[in-house]
């Protein structure tokens, strides 16, 4: 039987239900007032759900300490039939002792196939990855979503994390969020070298934003083409680091190995990327010709007209692309830059979804008109979102009127969002 506790629904409704009959249990306690006593009662109730196969439990922002984790873990450890587990434990006070209690749970859950574990903003250090070592017992695990962002993880912690992942031989989908920690060159490279051993991965999402990554942190992968032959979807977030053109060159070399990618998402916002870096990146991405979804975010870098031109070459090369999301805000594209990477879109015959964020680029009235002319040729697009705010464009002026008229001629358009606010 399925049971779902909705928003402010009393937790007692769960306590009074037929606990042994639950197979699918959804407990979102985000809006609940939870103290240690309620954690104790919740744990007692969960321990009676012996037939449970799927559990979603959201306890974020509840100030759970090691005592609370002791109660909770003692209940979870008895749920031997679980195949899917989502534990949202972010923004707590979980320390090394709490992690030890939680680790004991995964030594017993042999049937787990899918695990989402959020430990965002706790007190986790490099000594606390025993939890992933415990996951070695979960050999049926296919999907892992692990969030340890906003903790105190350094290079040693990243290395330990990577080493633990190598034991999960059946992983096909991995989402790893280690953003806002203290991971530098060695940690990132050790983590990358370990991921290379996860040869069955089909979907990989890695968030390393807000760390100490520089140009040397583009992974220690030596045989990526062979190791990631099955990879179809790749998402990398290196925003708010210290990456320049040299780092982008290393990233390009890595990406050139993934010739079978269908989905590529890159976030490099707030780094030190310039026109040379973009040219190098585009050159290496020419080997990736199977991409249907492409998302690139390069806001607050040092990109000019040449970057826009090179990105247009990349777009032109992706003949199978159906979705494009491009964020180039806070750069120096100017009116010509805004036009150049749009003018090639008419060659992307399969493109149906287009999102362009171009705010703060000195595009001006001329750029807006040129943009409209280019878009009017993209008759196949059904969803369009364009942000041209803060570009010296009069939102009640001629340029905006022309742009709107041009877009209205896109006959297949279903949804459109145009933003001009200055």
Roles of regions detected by a PLM:
Residues 6-16, 18-24, 35-45, 47-54, 65-75, 77-84, 95-114, ...:
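Leucine-rich repeat
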Residues 8, 13, 22-39, 69, ...:
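Intrinsically disordered, low-complexity linker/propeptide segments enriched in Ser/Thr/Gly/Pro
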Residues 8-9, 36, 63, 81-82, ...:
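N-terminal cationic leader/targeting segments used for protein routing and processing
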Residues 43-44, 73-74, 84, 103-104, ...:
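Ser/Thr/Pro-rich low-complexity tandem-repeat tracts
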Residues 224, 230-231, 235, 241, ...:
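C-terminal capping region of solenoid repeat domains
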């Amino acid at each position: 039987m399925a049971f779902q506790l909705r928003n402010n629904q009393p937790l007692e409704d769960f306590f009074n239900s037929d606990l042994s009959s639950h197979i699918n249990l959804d407990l979102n306690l985000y809006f609940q007032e939870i103290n240690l006593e309620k954690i104790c009662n919740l744990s007692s109730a969960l321990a009676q759900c012996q037939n449970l196969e799927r559990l979603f439990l959201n306890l974020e922002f509840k100030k759970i300490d090691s005592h609370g984790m002791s109660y909770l873990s003692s209940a979870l450890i008895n749920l031997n039939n679980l195949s899917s587990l989502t534990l949202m434990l972010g923004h707590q006070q979980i320390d090394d002792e709490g992690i030890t209690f939680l680790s004991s749970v995964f030594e017993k859950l042999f049937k787990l196939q899918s695990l989402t574990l959020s430990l965002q903003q706790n007190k986790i250090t490099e000594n606390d990855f025993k939890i992933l070592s415990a996951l070695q017992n979960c050999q049926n695990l296919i999907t892992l979503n692990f969030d340890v962002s906003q903790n105190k993880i350094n290079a040693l912690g990243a290395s330990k994390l990577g080493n633990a992942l190598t034991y999960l031989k059946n992983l096909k989908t991995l989402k790893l969020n280690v953003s806002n920690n203290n991971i530098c060159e060695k940690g990132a490279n050790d983590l990358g070298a370990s991921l290379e051993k996860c040869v069955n991965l089909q979907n990989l999402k890695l968030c390393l934003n807000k760390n100490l990554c520089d140009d040397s942190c583009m992974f220690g992968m030596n045989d990526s083409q062979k190791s990631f032959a099955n990879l179809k979807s790749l998402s990398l977030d290196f925003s708010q680091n210290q990456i320049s053109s040299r780092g982008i060159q290393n990233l390009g070399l890595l990406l050139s190995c993934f010739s079978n990618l269908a989905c590529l998402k890159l976030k490099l916002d707030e780094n030190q990327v310039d026109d040379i870096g973009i040219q190098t990146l585009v050159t290496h991405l020419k080997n990736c010709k199977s991409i249907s979804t492409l998302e690139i975010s390069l806001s607050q870098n040092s990109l000019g007209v040449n970057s826009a031109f090179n990105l247009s070459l990349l777009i032109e090369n992706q003949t199978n692309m159906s979705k494009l999301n491009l964020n180039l805000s806070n750069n120096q594209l100017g009116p010509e830059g805004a036009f150049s990477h749009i003018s090639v879109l008419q060659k992307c015959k399969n493109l149906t979804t287009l999102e362009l964020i171009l705010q703060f680029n000195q595009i001006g009235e001329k750029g807006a008109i040129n943009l409209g002319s280019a878009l009017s040729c993209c008759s196949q697009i059904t969803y369009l979102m364009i942000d041209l705010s803060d570009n010296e464009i009069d939102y009640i002026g001629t340029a905006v009127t022309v742009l709107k008229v041009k877009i209205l001629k896109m006959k297949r358009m279903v949804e459109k969002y145009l933003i001009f606010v200055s």
